[in-house]
Swiss-Prot record:
Endoribonuclease; cleaves preferentially 3' to purine-pyrimidine dinucleotide motifs in single-stranded RNA. The cleavage product contains a free 3' -OH group. Has no activity with double-stranded RNA or DNA. Required for normal mitochondrial function and cell viability. It is found in: Mitochondrion matrix. Its main location: mitochondrion. Binds 2 Zn(2+) ions per subunit. Gene3D superfamilies: Ribonuclease Z/Hydroxyacylglutathione hydrolase-like, Winged helix-like DNA-binding domain superfamily/Winged helix DNA-binding domain. The modification N6-succinyllysine is found at K273. It comes from the Eukaryota. Its cofactor is Zn(2+). This is Endoribonuclease LACTB2. The modification Phosphoserine is found at S235. It comes from Bos taurus (Bovine). InterPro entries: LACTB2-like_MBL-fold, LACTB2_WH, Metallo-B-lactamas, RibonucZ/Hydroxyglut_hydro, Sec-metab_biosynth-thioest, WH-like_DNA-bd_sf. Zn(2+) 1 binds at H77, H79, E118, H145, D164.
Length: 288
């Protein structure tokens, strides 16, 4: 059963979580947005989805309760449940200047707009430092979930804002498995004490959680290879593999599991361990 999260919660002396009020199968209890710092102006990490008045109300309440304002906004990646609230925040929460909204560029680069194009992103790069009173954030490029994904190290706490690279409950989806595994290994090197994830509760055993994620993906890959080795001459579609491997996963999540299996298959095919054919639908079999 998923943990119950408060809509507004002070997690440490410099981190306040404001829940995005957008619960769902992919967002868990909702998107975690964070106010970071200790002063009268703080950094907001992620913004939830568009047109969620409950979130804007909670964010306003948090700003009032902690007597602070938004210095700038950082979004961990381009997905709608992290960038979607930018326009509503800019319209509904007054600021003395236009909000600066920072993110990593897409890779390969492409034009991005905020809302109707009334604002543009300020792009940062791996290793950049973003400061506010009481908090120093270091940008870490962590592609895999998306091509523009960033994590942020909170230097004062040796804590990690992981975006959707690591979730508080369950596992995440990704676009590129090779990049994603490398990103997990890079996050492991940070030796963070705590992880503030993009969805779900705070993770206090950071190293164990990252190792669990790495192990989980390695186990999935081995499960796929086992199916091929035990059925050496047989070809499988991605969904056939899902039904063989994800037996304990609810059927409504099989499409998401298929996405992950396809990424494993692409990686294994690239490594020459399996081959594919498209007659009449795409199937894979073990490579001699």
């Amino acid at each position: 059963m998923a943990a119950t999260l408060q809509r507004i919660e002070r997690l440490s002396s410099r981190v306040i979580r404001v829940l995005g009020c957008n619960p769902g199968p992919m967002t868990l209890q909702g998107t975690n947005t964070y106010l970071v710092g200790t002063g009268p102006r703080r950094i907001l990490i992620d913004t939830g989805e568009p047109s969620i008045p409950e979130y804007i109300s909670c964010l306003k309440q948090a700003l009032t309760e902690f007597n602070t304002a938004i210095q700038e906004i950082i979004v961990t990646h381009w997905h709608r449940d992290h960038t979607g609230g930018i326009g509503d925040i800019c319209k509904s929460i007054n600021n003395d200047t236009t909000y600066c909204v920072k993110k990593l560029p897409r890779n390969p680069e492409r034009k991005e707009i905020i809302g109707n194009g009334e604002q543009q992103y300020v792009y940062v790069k791996d290793g950049d430092i973003i400061k506010t009173e009481g908090a120093t954030l270091r940008v870490v490029y962590t592609p895999g979930h998306t091509d523009d994904h960033m994590a942020l190290v909170l230097e004062e706490e040796n804590a990690l804002f992981s975006g959707d690279c690591i979730l508080g409950e369950g596992t995440t989806v990704f676009e590129d498995l090779y990049d994603y595994m490398n990103s997990l290994k890079e996050l492991l090197k940070i030796k963070a004490k705590v992880i503030y994830p993009g969805h779900g509760p705070v993770i206090h055993n950071a190293e164990a959680k990252i190792l669990q994620y790495i192990s989980h993906r390695n186990i999935r890959e081995q499960q796929i290879l086992t199916v091929f080795h035990e059925n050496f001459e047989k070809s499988f579609t991605a969904m056939e593999l899902v039904k063989s491997i994800y037996k304990d996963t609810p059927e409504h999540l099989h499409k998401m599991a298929q996405h992950n299996v396809l990424l494993h298959l692409k990686k294994l095919e690239k490594e020459g361990k399996i081959v594919s054919n498209t007659d009449p639908e795409k199937k894979w079999k073990a490579h001699l």
